From Swiss-Prot:
Keywords: Amino-acid biosynthesis, Branched-chain amino acid biosynthesis, Chloroplast, Magnesium, NADP, Oxidoreductase, Plastid. It comes from Populus euphratica (Euphrates poplar). Its EC number is 1.1.1.86. GO terms for molecular function: ketol-acid reductoisomerase activity. This is Ketol-acid reductoisomerase, chloroplastic.
């Protein structure tokens, strides 16, 4: 997930 949909930036391989 990303901080674009108001979600917490999870430590994932974007």
């Amino acid at each position: 997930f990303y901080e674009k949909e108001g979600l917490p930036a999870f430590p994932m391989g974007k």
